[in-house]
Amino acid sequence: MAELTALHTLTAQMKREGIRRLLVLSGEEGWCFEHTLKLRDALPGDWLWISPRPDAENHCSPSALQTLLGREFRHAVFDARHGFDAAAFAALSGTLKAGSWLVLLLPVWEEWENQPDADSLRWSDCPDPIATPHFVQHLKRVLTADNEAILWRQNQPFSLAHFTPRTDWYPATGAPQPEQQQLLKQLMTMPPGVAAVTAARGRGKSALAGQLISRIAGRAIVTAPAKASTDVLAQFAGGKFRFIAPDALLASDEQADWLVVDEAAAIPAPLLHQLVSRFPRTLLTTTVQGYEGTGRGFLLKFCARFPHLHRFELQQPIRWAQGCPLEKMVSEALVFDDENFTHTPQGNIVISAFEQTLWQSDPETPLKVYQLLSGAHYRTSPLDLRRMMDAPGQHFLQAAGENEIAGALWLVDEGGLSQQLSQAVWAGFRRPRGNLVAQSLAAHGNNPLAATLRGRRVSRIAVHPARQREGTGRQLIAGALQYTQDLDYLSVSFGYTGELWRFWQRCGFVLVRMGNHREASSGCYTAMALLPMSDAGKQLAEREHYRLRRDAQALAQWNGETLPVDPLNDAVLSDDDWLELAGFAFAHRPLLTSLGCLLRLLQTSELALPALRGRLQKNASDAQLCTTLKLSGRKMLLVRQREEAAQALFALNDVRTERLRDRITQWQLFH
């Protein structure tokens, strides 16, 4: 085939130039498969095949691709005919050597946007795959506008454009590149303080950190979210590499001249602050674009607390040439170029709402909103882009200045469950998809009908740094109330800090829940708050806030943190307590969810109850209790704790307990 001969010649040119390209095959299954095999036979290489189905020898499923990161391949196939895993697509592109093709298999071009996407099961909260027209239209726009990508469609003439030759590229030898060399000199002479190195993936951040460690006269300690991710750093650091996990380092009294934190944005900020304060010099490295999330928000929030921070950026790629067409296309397709906050939005702020259909009529506006949200939130990923474009129940507001987006708010519909399903969620018998806050209000609150109410949860909110402290965030929340009809409440779930809570409080939210363990992503306890919009919403917020006040002392003792509520010293078992205790004793409600009422039960009961008292009053570990009580493990311990709660309730009032048991047991029969 003349096409294959031309592609063979072009591949040799790409290798000389140090670039990679995308080749799209769009058509029926048999046609795509046949042409992929012809490409594989004509162009020697590894031909890694990413597909949910094992269609080839060198096969890997999209979900298992993370296990291959750090390795390199020549040529790969990404099968997106039944679903498009955007993060896997981006990750695959990062494994390809200079001179490689990424062959993207797509359905028939005209049918693609109406075809259900199996990947939507991961992010849409729908029981079945849904069509994703906005993402498909966006991807089509990017592909057809990209003169460097090759689009080969079934029943369409194939033509290979003439690509202007680029300058020859010479791969890195392992020695520091000029950009790295200059940065190393600055770091070597840096006075005590904190330095942050940011870069897109493949720029040599980890290599730079390792080279610094190998050159300094003193000692260095390396920490990172996972030791496995520091292999490159260790290779360049040589014998001076010493790794200690973040939590272990904090618990130790280790000292060193330098602390090097690889992928610092993935470490909880409170933990990172404590670590940085212990060492005279700290180097933080983090990724500012990519499939694992953006580190721009990390720079904004964390590094802003260090006024004399030394900031550096690596821009030159190491493993392929600058301006690689594949890297450029993936970045545009998955919107990796987040807002860099270099331009200040001018003029008065105007709040307006928009829906997902704007991706069709005016894609630039939602694109800018996504870039703002991505730049401000570290954990924004391609999954969020897909959800924003096509998941049901998504709503948006923008705060627009004269020339730029100054702020954005992303809301998600929640609640509206049937009475029977809400009761089953409360009892711990069911846990359907989605409805983060609505389900938590039922599963962790004391109202079995909480999830029947309709709410709208704040998924993301961001304001441009140059326009903060002007009330724009409050304006966005007020706009959400104005544009929202027939709902019971707005809700938010966030990693609790005093500063964040003051913002939500000023917006009118009522605190209704505090978690009982720190989240790994934030290092904070999860807090949930409601802004009532109906009488039913107001009653729910008041009831849950009252419960939080009653449980405040117990939670503070358990967490070691004072709650921002006025605590009530009330040891009398209420009707709500009785219902919740029965939910623990006779259903599947978690132990710590019922912490407050269980402690009140222990104060009221005269029974021994060793499994409950040992855990909640004496703070014995599960392992200690299992040994003492001769139980085989945690599951049996929890069974014993439920049995003890039932014994205590029957001893207090057997008739009432039996009535509650029968009532709650019925909720398990819901299908």
Where are the regions that the model predicts?
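N-terminal pre-P-loop "Q-motif" helix
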Residues: A2-L10, P171-P191
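Conserved lysine of the Walker
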Residues: C32-F33, K205
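Conserved beta-hairpin
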Residues: G393-V412, Q419
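Conserved acetyl-CoA-binding loop-helix of GNAT-fold acetyltransferases
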Residues: A207-Q211, R460-Q482
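Terminal substrate-recognition subdomain of acyl/acetyltransferases
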Residues: A248-L250, W258, P270-L271, S277-Y378, ...
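Conserved RecA-like ASCE P-loop NTPase motor core of nucleic-acid helicases/translocases
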Residues: R20-E28, K38-P52, A196-T198, G218-T230
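Conserved coupling/interface region of RecA-like P-loop/ASCE motor cores
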Residues: D125-A175, C303-T342
